[in-house]
Amino acid sequence: MTIRILPARLANQIAAGEVVERPASVVKELVENSLDAGATRIDIDLEKGGAKLIRIRDNGSGIDKDELGLALSRHATSKIHTLDDLEAIMSLGFRGEALASISSVSRLTLTSRTVAQEEAWSAYSEGRDMAVKLQPAAHPVGTTVEVLDLFFNTPARRKFLRTEKTEFTHIDELLKRIALSRFDVSFTLRHNGKIVRQYRAATTLPQQEKRLAAVCGNPFVQHMLRIELEHQGLKLHGWITTPEGARQQSDLQYCYVNGRMMRDKLINHAIRQSYETSLRVDQFATYVLFIELDPHQVDVNVHPAKHEVRFHQARLVHDFIYQALSSALVQGAQVMAPTINEGAFHLPHCAEEVNPPVVPMIDTTQQERVWQAVQNTPDYPRKAPRDNDRDESDNPQVRERAVSNPWVASPKTASTGKERYGSASVSKKEAAVYQTLMQTPDLSDEEPSTASTIVSSIEAVKANIAIEKLGKAIQVVAGQYLLMSSPQGCVLISLYQAQQLKLRGLLNAQHGALKAQPLLVPLALKLNESEWQVAQRHSSALLQLGIELKSRTNHSIMVMAVPQPLRQQNLQQLLPDLLSYAASCSESQALSHQALADWLTQRIVVEKRDYTLAEAIGLIAELEQLWQGNLPLQDPHFITLVDFSASITALHS
């Protein structure tokens, strides 16, 4: 067979097989051209799901008369001119194939006018006849592309089109994705003469959230968390939802790289990993995320439909997304967890302004990862199966303990879009829960007065009576201590010791070994021979603590997993120090779990000097839950009775 160069019309129709899959593909290419032209308003008109008519009108920069015919030629574009331009693409289109491919399988009319022109011009092209006809037209500054009778000259492809409703649904979903990528652009969608969607330009955050609600629905907005992070030239911003906002299908997953819609396996793998411990098998995360980075660090010319990209520093991008979302979910869980309602405090002073939490940035490691997991990841994140998918709230013992605990408020239901923090309006039920902590006790027969509490405190100090239980929180003293009442009198609690008790409670292994959480990237540690021997000798004790080590050579080990309390620590420095501590113990002395937990507690907990009353109460509430009422109330470093004798003597003198 003779080798020949294909005719232009045939080459365009072959290219159309990749570019023009269905009417939604035409809308995508034309709307992206409008966005590249700087349009701030785009109108989309459809008839019969786009099979009969697709009309895209914008107010962009327009196309000059002399370039109208060239615009319909294959590989003709204004986006790139050199190889350097191809390696630093910021525009959505760049191949110059869309208009030529569309015109080869439809009847296309391109009408445009630039600011410099006094009149508009129209170019007409029909499938079999590739000749372009120019004629004057009436049109404002901008461009209108009209596509009639899609696939009229390729019956084999036309018969694969679905019903009008199905094709319109694809276009509607496409427009939602585009509308979320450009909040500054107004979009109007008409179908068979009726306005179906209208998204007004959103320049402020409330307006953007309004568009989010219009596209993703109110449940998304009610459970969403806004994130914005930047690290080593990478920027991640957008919205994710708490696990309560998960759905049974993956229809609310929107990700963009430099403004381009993406369904990339690497990105989805990182997102799936961050939600892995939060969602059930049949749940899907919901998010709208924007990733911005140097265009030289990403290759967008790797997929015919440009749905996938290739990152030059894929490991850095993957870890950045994973750490950012994991930290945001942890912060969100702390905000949405049962908290003390400020509105129930009835304090005479105004409530302090609540600052948004700062998500910590954790340095990414530089070790080799197993990319097979990334390659096998589906297009949408799906959580891996777990041994126990039951929510903790399903346990009646947990529910009973949470309700009976006077320190913690009942879990809130989904927000209604209003402010999530406490307000002055509090129900009687909430007030009843918190009054045991926050309200000054009433002078009644059933409850001792403040004066009697002070007298009891004085008598208890003199008699050296043991403290049996805690009562009401009164005030934070010197930023580090919490003054509380008790049946034995007023007591002062060290909040620094309380933090240590909290971590010790988290590291408690009384119910078996702590659960080891695998690291996304195993950490390699270089050790000397003695440290390596210590790691081998005490591997079982470390595993009981949730630290899983794997030997590589006589001078290095791999840290495969750590317990949850250590996830946010600098393991590169902490673990060698832990092994040094283990080496300092005598060889005959068995290294107990308690000894390791005590050392970690002393090493990790940092003294804080500016506790608020709400923070102090929340800390004590966590202690009550962790220790289940068995707090060391006899520890003089943790709690002490307050002796008012000297103060009373001074008042009477």
UniProtKB/Swiss-Prot annotation:
UniProt keywords, alphabetically: DNA damage, DNA repair
GO (cellular component) term, any one: mismatch repair complex
DNA damage listed as a keyword: yes
Alphabetical list of SUPFAM superfamilies matching this protein: ATPase domain of HSP90 chaperone/DNA topoisomerase II/histidine kinase (SSF55874), DNA mismatch repair protein MutL (SSF118116), Ribosomal protein S5 domain 2-like (SSF54211)
One GO term (biological process): mismatch repair
A GO MF term: ATP hydrolysis activity
Source domain of life: Bacteria
Residue ranges with Basic and acidic residues bias: 380-389
Residue ranges, annotated region (Disordered): 375-425
Classification via InterPro entries: DNA_mismatch_repair_CS, DNA_mismatch_repair_MutL, DNA_mismatch_S5_2-like, HATPase_C_sf, MutL/Mlh/PMS, MutL/Mlh/Pms-like, MutL_C, MutL_C_dimsub
UniProt family annotation: Belongs to the DNA mismatch repair MutL/HexB family.
Function: This protein is involved in the repair of mismatches in DNA. It is required for dam-dependent methyl-directed DNA mismatch repair. May act as a 'molecular matchmaker', a protein that promotes the formation of a stable complex between two or more DNA-binding proteins in an ATP-dependent manner without itself being part of a final effector complex.
Name of the protein: DNA mismatch repair protein MutL
Gene assigned in the entry: mutL
